[in-house]
């Protein structure tokens, strides 16, 4: 049954069979932000079942408003299911935040965040993502970042306190993942508007100073704030090089969706096909240069799981193209080794071989055209149909 389930999931994922030994492998998880639109039920567990059937393996639970006590039972059931499987659960805190506001505004935001921290443990969340909100009375940079370092240090401590101590086995027997997994990572998300704290540089600086945090790269926000910047695979390579140099590590948590933007500000999410932010360049980067990465991508699109599957299909296509290119290069290398040539010399020889062939074909084609262009000799109008040898007819003769 276990083998059957493994092969069933492989087939559903479009043939993601293990690569040969020795070949570097990237860990990629994809899923929607919330219960799938196509799910007949509306509980988290039913949503997880539907996501798995679609060949996806991650989900982000949205706690846009305060978490109610009656939600906790289904959160715990989802946590048990994710612990027993390879399904990744994540949590998103309140969208509206004012961590840089007045003391009253900050405390109100922190009280909302507390509920998502409690739910994060119940659901076995790998990441709990938070927004910071407006700059308030702070200027971008130094002082604001220092304040947030203090705030998120307290948030991380609180998450670890809620997660509990694995030595206290009796108290936490209902949460077996406490003994096997690390506490949830606190994600700090990049923002999509100029008046909101959250450039990539700001997020990286705070994460660098607070252990237990992780930058959440929202590609739609990055694209909008950069006036439509994320257009090529090189743009993504530059972004992840920046993160690797300034933050380190190989684990990444990202959001992706189409976005409508104006003057450096995100207006609202759209489906990927209707946006100038395309997933193909990102897929190309992941396929070509992402072997060192452990990455989770959450679909924020209004189409949720449909665009998550769309992203998975484009990644598979990019990966297939790369494998074809590698196979061609390996074939060229084998031929070069067999003939005692350098691969570059083999490429030149192939061109030299091809050029005469092409010229021969062209000459044959030209000869055929010349023959076909020969005008037939005119016949006499006389009744005996004898060939006319008049001088005007000889002018048309190719001989």
Q: Predicted regions span which residues?
A:
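N-terminal pre-domain/capping segments
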Residues: 2-115, 214, 324-364, 376-380, ...
């Amino acid at each position: 049954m276990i083998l059957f389930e493994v092969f069933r999931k492989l087939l559903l994922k479009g043939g993601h069979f293990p690569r040969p030994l020795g070949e570097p492998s990237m860990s990629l998880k994809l899923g929607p932000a919330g219960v799938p639109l196509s799910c007949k039920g509306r509980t988290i567990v039913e949503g997880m079942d539907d996501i798995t059937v679609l060949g996806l393996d991650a989900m982000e639970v949205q706690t846009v408003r305060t978490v109610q006590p009656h939600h906790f039972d289904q959160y715990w059931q989802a946590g048990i299911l994710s612990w027993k499987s390879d399904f990744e659960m994540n949590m998103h805190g309140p969208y509206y935040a004012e961590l840089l506001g007045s003391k009253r505004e900050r405390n109100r935001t922190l009280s909302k965040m507390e509920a998502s921290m409690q739910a994060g443990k119940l659901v076995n969340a790998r990441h709990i993502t938070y927004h910071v909100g407006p700059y308030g009375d702070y200027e971008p940079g130094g002082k604001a970042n220092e304040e947030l370092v203090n705030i998120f240090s307290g948030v991380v401590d609180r998450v670890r306190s809620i997660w509990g101590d694995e030595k206290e086995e009796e108290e936490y027997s209902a949460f077996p993942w406490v003994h096997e997994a690390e506490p949830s990572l606190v994600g700090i998300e990049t923002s999509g508007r100029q008046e909101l704290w959250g450039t990539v540089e700001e997020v990286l600086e705070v994460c660098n100073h607070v252990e237990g945090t992780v930058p959440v790269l929202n590609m739609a926000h990055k694209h909008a704030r950069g006036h439509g910047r994320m257009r090529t695979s090189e743009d993504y390579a530059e972004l992840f090089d920046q993160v690797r140099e300034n933050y380190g590590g190989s684990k990444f948590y990202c959001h992706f969706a189409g976005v409508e933007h104006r003057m450096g500000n995100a207006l609202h999410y759209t489906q990927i096909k209707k946006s100038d932010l395309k997933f193909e360049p990102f897929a190309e980067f992941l396929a070509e240069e992402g072997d060192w990465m452990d990455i989770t991508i959450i679909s924020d699109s209004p189409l949720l799981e449909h665009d998550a599957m769309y992203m998975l299909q484009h990644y598979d296509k990019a990966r297939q193209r790369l494998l074809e290119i590698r196979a061609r290069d390996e074939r060229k290398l084998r031929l070069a080794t067999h003939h005692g040539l350098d691969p570059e010399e083999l490429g030149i020889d192939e061109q030299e071989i091809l050029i005469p062939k092409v010229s021969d074909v062209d000459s044959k084609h030209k000869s055929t055209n010349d023959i076909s262009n020969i005008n037939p000799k005119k016949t006499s109008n006389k009744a005996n149909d004898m060939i006319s040898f008049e001088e005007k007819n000889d002018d048309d003769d190719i001989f």
